[in-house]
Amino acid sequence: MKDYYGKDISTLKNKKLFLFDMDGTINLGNELIPGMEGFFDKLKAAGREYYLLTNNSSRDHQHYVNKMNGLGVPVTRENVLISTDAFTNYMSKNHPDGKFYVLGTPQLEKNIADAGLTMTKTLEEGADFVVVGFDQTLTYEKLTTACRLIDKGVPYVATHPDVRCPIEGGEFIPDTGAMIELIKTATGKSPSMIFGKPFQY
């Protein structure tokens, strides 16, 4: 048996666990990609486990659980992994007392706070790391503070590298990678670490 690209996929029948990206693979925005209807029901019926992954750091797990179930994809909180998980797990283990200035949505900030990490809000408070996430609430003031901290020598990290986020109708909106490029242009510096797919953290 071969796939669309002519590659042998017969070995898939022996796999017990599958990992799937969400945005652009299972769905585009609030629309299921054609051909995905009933696919996960078949996986479950075959006794296979699966996890759904996303680099989108602007939301929390429950958002994706609700969204996927609403699209007919049966999933629980335990089956959803977001790039914020990689970031908070790493920082909780390696920099538990660090201070983080976050470019991100209120939900990303909540996810970070729920992990027990400390955030700062102003230039005067300083930071040990600037965190660049998928910030749909980005303002010039937040961007300026981030760049000034970075210019002062504060390293910055990113929750994921995606430049564009796919949405309904085959369109795209700017994602974290685009914000990284903006900061690189303004400061001349690259992130010290990037989390999320395809990176190892």
Label every model-predicted segment.
Residues 1-22, 26-201:
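HAD-like aspartate-dependent phosphatase fold
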